[in-house]
Design a protein with these regions (language model features):
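Alpha/beta-hydrolase active-site loop
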Residues: 70, 96-118, 123-125, 133-137
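The feature captures the conserved acid-bearing segment of alpha/beta-hydrolase catalytic domains
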Residues: 157-213, 217
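Hydrophobic membrane-insertion alpha-helices, especially the h-region
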Residues: 13-31
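Short, surface-exposed "cap/lid" segments of acyl-processing enzymes
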Residues: 36-83, 87-91
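C-terminal catalytic histidine-bearing segment of alpha/beta-hydrolase fold enzymes
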Residues: 209, 214-246
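A conserved short beta-strand
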Residues: 145-161
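N-terminal Lys/Arg-rich, disordered targeting/topogenic segments
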Residues: 1-12
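Catalytic nucleophile serine of serine hydrolases
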Residues: 128-130, 157
Length: 246
């Protein structure tokens, strides 16, 4: 008697499709949570100790948004030290492709929020990964008068090139870069700059930068810095506490 060996295949195929659907729904749900579908751009962390004697902080998140990754953890640590912090959800703002001029406007708006929140006229700008790329690209387009409130700029694991769009395609490394990073980053000669990279990181902008106003910091790990938000916060703090020299 010949057995029908094919009768269970549809069931296995259906199970495979169901699993794939669950994975896709999970990914979509994650991106909705992270902010790909237009969550609020800004998140404000007020501080009781805020005032004119200390700067406020603006943090541009990486391409996974300001709800996950290092940005919310570092922001919480800095806020616990008494700094008012405004985080920017780069995933939400840059989910459509933007320009350097639009990035500059975003930074300017975040600065105004931070100054009001921190009751101060000085800000420190921090960019994480994709946010670091957008930070130096935007600052290159910012008018001189708007730069006066910036005490320091911190670029955390910036890349060798720039893409003005945050998306799953960009995250997977499948998007064609829009520009090299060095031409705009090297224009940050008017403000103290800190460039932080992972010691095992490839494709980092930091080794390419060479300016007298630049401080370089190597931390253990690759692009994700071993997820050590305490070490990253410690590397950022000197840029915050040191007064800007005119």
């Amino acid at each position: 008697m010949i057995k029908d060996t094919n009768r269970y295949r549809p069931a296995r195929g259906t199970a495979g499709l169901a699993l794939l659907l669950l994975i896709l729904l999970g990914c979509a749900g994650y991106y909705v949570y992270a902010g790909y579908y237009r969550h609020d751009i800004f998140r404000e962390l007020p501080a009781a100790d805020a005032g004119p004697e200390r700067p406020a902080i603006v943090m541009l998140s990486g391409d996974m948004g300001n709800r996950v990754g290092m940005t919310p953890k570092v922001a919480a640590r800095l806020n616990a030290r008494g700094y008012a912090v405004v985080t920017v959800n780069s995933l939400s703002f840059f989910s459509p492709r933007r320009t350097a001029t639009e990035a500059a406007a975003l930074i300017g708006g975040a600065m105004h929020r931070a100054e009001a929140l921190g009751k101060t006229s000085e800000v420190v700008l921090i960019g994480q990964s994709f946010g670091a790329d957008m930070l130096h690209a935007g600052l290159a387009e910012m008018p001189t008068a708007a730069r006066r409130q910036i005490r320091a700029v911190v670029l955390v694991v910036p890349g060798h090139d720039i893409i003005f769009r945050a998306s799953p395609i960009e995250l997977a490394g499948l998007e064609t870069p829009d520009a090299l990073a060095l031409p705009t980053a090297s224009r940050l000669t008017w403000v103290p700059v800190t460039c932080i990279r992972g010691a095992g990181e490839d494709n980092s902008l930091c080794p390419e930068m060479d300016m007298p106003n630049l401080r370089k910091v190597d931390l253990p790990g690759g692009h994700r810095l071993n997820g050590d938000d305490a070490a990253l916060t410690a590397a950022i703090l000197p840029a915050i506490v040191q007064p800007r020299s005119e």
